[in-house]
Every structure is written in structure tokens, then in C-alpha cells.
């Protein structure tokens, strides 16, 4: 007998791992009911992942579930929010119980890893896609937005850039992971780390923040447009991993870093006088952050300008991923 929607949910997704006092009503009713702490605001984000647009048909259900969760939590991290709850809308072409079992176990394990509770969702038949709505909370009026960059701010990025795009390139070419560099790059694509603790550490010192989902050029451009300013970025300051430099030349590595996307690192700005405070806060975290440029007065459009050793250079490759432009 074919498994129905409610049987599927009950068997695979109603295995609540966490006991969460903030959840008064969860899976099994028309809505979930949750409580937000006093003097905090609710932060909400939604992302959809569609097969052949956001992920390859060859991705494992374990990696797909992890990445679907992590990319949503990354949005909350950029706001400085504490992730708390998610709902899942899962569209499946058919009911493959082995696939669903593996996917659900990975999803619930990932949620437990980040202390997040699944509180509801929906399933339907169609081409494979995953939509997750993630919710969290941030102290009232303390959320880090995109529109408050100030002239003179220093621009920082976390960890290293371009690894995900380099890993995806290897996967698209059918390259097996034959050494530690390959493993590192491919895992950076399949298993990004949402910088939740970093986002919270930036509250009170960062003017703006964004997670790098579409590439540095594109995502920094969002900050510049919302903040009505321009920026200079020093290419020699871009943090590149030893793995990407072992596998690609510097020019290709920079291209991955600037326009590859899906690094899910944080890009943020702080006023220069908070530089020491930032370094102090970073000592408590295992996440290096690198200053790559500064915010300037608006000049021309909102695309960042690039320097190499302090001298202006032109960037000729793509600015980043855009769902609709890429489909034309």
C-alpha cells in the first residue's frame, strides 16, 4: 500500500529529538505555537532548494538535508539571531522510503546539532524541492541589517572564500576526492557552516552583515545598494585556503572567491574604532575574519571597486549567481 502524506510525516518527521519549552504546539495541528522571550524580536527566513537549480541529482540525501538546514540558519546568523525553530515543505516525485528515511534522519540530526526544533511543514508530489522556513530571535532593535553601512567602515569576511565554488567545479567534472584538499573543497560545498556564534558576537559593533550565498561581488553589492554607498576591496587581502591554492592558480581562486557563491561566510562592516573590540571577541571563537576593504562615498553604481596592491583593476567575470538571469 502506498504511503500517504500523514503516514509519511508521522513515521519520518514526527520523531521529535528536542524537548523545547518554547514550543506549545507542534507537528500535528494546523499551526505551531511558539513563545518568543520578552524583549526579543522574531527573525524569519525562507529558502527553497530545487533539484538541478540549487543541487545536483547526484547529491546524497544526507548532504541535501544538512545543506537545506544550514543555508537557512546562515541567514539567521547574518542577522545576529539565535536559531530556534524550522518548518519544512518537501516536494517529492515519489515516495522512496529509503531516501526519505535517510533524508529525515540527517535533517533531524542537523537540527539537533544546532539546537533547533522542527515544528511543522507540508509534503506534496512534484519535482524534488525543499523549502525551509527558519525562525529565531534577536534582542529587540539589535538585529544586524544590510542598510546601515557607514563611510569609513572596514569590510570583513569570515574564514576563507571560494572553496564551495571550487568544490562544486570538481563535483561537476566528476572528480573524486583523492586527497585532503579535494575532500576539504567538496565538503565546503556540500556542508557549509552557518556562522551563528560569529553573528551574535557582532551585535553592537557591526553596522551591517550578510551571508555570502551568491558571491562576494553580488552580496557586498546588496549592502552597498541598501546603504547607498560604495566600497573598495583589495584583492591581495582575499582570504584563500591552502586547498584552493593547491588546486587552482591565484586568478581562478580569486574568481571563485568573488563570484562563485555558496560559501555562506559572513561579510560585515565595523567602524575602525571597533577593530580591537572585534579582535577581542574573535579570540573566543574559532573563526578567523579578514579585513578586505572599506566603505566609501557613493561613486557611480553600487558595485564594489577592486584594487591590487592599492592600484585599481577591472574585474571581467560574472558578478554572482542570479536564478532568473542564469535561466535566460
Swiss-Prot record:
Family in the record: Belongs to the thiamine-monophosphate kinase family.
EC number(s) given by UniProt: 2.7.4.16
Binding site for Mg(2+) 4: 30, 45, 75
SUPFAM superfamilies, alphabetized: PurM C-terminal domain-like, PurM N-terminal domain-like
InterPro entries the record matches: PurM-like_C_dom, PurM-like_C_sf, PurM-like_N, PurM-like_N_sf, ThiL-like
Function text: Catalyzes the ATP-dependent phosphorylation of thiamine-monophosphate (TMP) to form thiamine-pyrophosphate (TPP), the active form of vitamin B1.
Protein's name in the database: Thiamine-monophosphate kinase
Positions of Mg(2+) 2 binding: 47, 75
GO biological process: thiamine biosynthetic process; thiamine diphosphate biosynthetic process
Database matches in PANTHER family: THIAMINE-MONOPHOSPHATE KINASE
UniProt miscellaneous comment: Reaction mechanism of ThiL seems to utilize a direct, inline transfer of the gamma-phosphate of ATP to TMP rather than a phosphorylated enzyme intermediate.
Annotated organism of origin: Haemophilus influenzae (strain ATCC 51907 / DSM 11121 / KW20 / Rd)
Binding annotation for Mg(2+) 3: 30, 75, 211
Catalytic activity: thiamine phosphate + ATP = thiamine diphosphate + ADP
Annotated residues for binding of Mg(2+) 1: 46-47, 122
EC primary class: transferase
Residues annotated as binding ATP: 121-122, 146, 213
MF annotations from Gene Ontology: ATP binding; magnesium ion binding; thiamine-phosphate kinase activity
Residues involved in substrate binding: 54, 262, 321
Superkingdom: Bacteria
Amino acid at each position: 500500500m502506498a504511503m500517504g502524506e500523514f503516514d509519511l510525516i508521522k513515521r519520518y518527521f514526527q520523531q521529535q529529538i528536542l524537548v523545547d519549552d518554547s514550543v506549545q504546539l507542534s507537528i500535528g495541528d494546523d499551526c505551531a505555537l511558539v513563545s518568543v522571550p520578552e524583549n526579543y524580536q522574531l527573525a524569519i527566513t525562507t529558502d527553497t532548494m530545487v533539484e538541478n537549480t540549487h543541487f545536483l541529482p547526484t547529491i546524497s540525501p544526507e548532504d541535501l538535508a544538512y545543506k537545506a538546514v544550514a543555508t537557512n540558519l546562515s541567514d539567521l546568523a547574518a542577522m545576529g539571531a539565535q536559531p530556534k525553530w524550522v518548518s519544512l515543505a518537501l516536494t517529492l516525485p515519489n515516495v522512496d522510503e529509503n531516501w526519505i528515511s535517510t533524508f529525515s534522519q540527517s535533517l533531524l540530526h542537523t537540527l539537533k546539532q544546532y539546537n533547533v526544533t522542527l515544528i511543522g511543514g507540508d509534503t506534496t508530489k512534484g519535482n524534488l524541492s525543499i523549502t525551509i522556513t527558519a525562525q529565531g530571535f534577536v534582542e529587540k532593535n539589535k538585529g544586524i541589517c544590510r542598510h546601515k553601512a557607514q563611510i569609513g567602515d572596514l569590510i570583513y569576511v569570515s574564514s576563507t572564500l571560494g572553496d564551495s565554488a571550487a568544490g562544486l567545479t570538481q563535483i561537476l567534472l566528476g572528480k573524486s576526492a583523492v586527497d585532503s584538499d579535494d575532500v576539504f573543497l567538496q565538503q565546503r560545498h556540500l556542508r557549509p557552516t552557518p556562522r551563528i556564534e560569529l553573528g551574535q558576537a557582532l551585535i553592537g559593533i557591526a553596522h551591517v552583515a550578510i551571508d555570502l550565498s551568491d558571491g562576494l561581488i553580488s552580496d557586498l553589492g546588496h549592502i552597498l545598494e541598501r546603504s547607498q554607498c560604495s566600497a573598495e576591496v583589495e584583492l591581495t587581502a582575499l582570504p584563500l585556503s591552502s586547498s584552493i591554492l593547491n588546486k587552482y592558480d591565484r586568478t581562478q581562486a580569486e574568481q571563485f572567491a568573488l563570484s562563485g557563491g555558496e560559501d555562506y561566510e559572513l561579510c560585515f562592516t565595523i567602524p575602525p574604532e571597533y577593530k580591537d573590540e572585534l579582535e577581542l571577541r574573535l579570540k573566543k571563537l574559532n573563526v578567523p575574519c579578514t579585513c578586505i576593504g572599506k566603505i566609501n562615498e557613493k561613486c557611480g553604481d553600487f558595485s564594489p571597486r577592486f584594487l591590487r596592491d592599492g592600484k585599481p583593476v577591472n574585474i571581467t567575470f560574472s558578478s554572482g549567481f542570479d536564478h532568473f538571469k542564469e535561466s535566460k
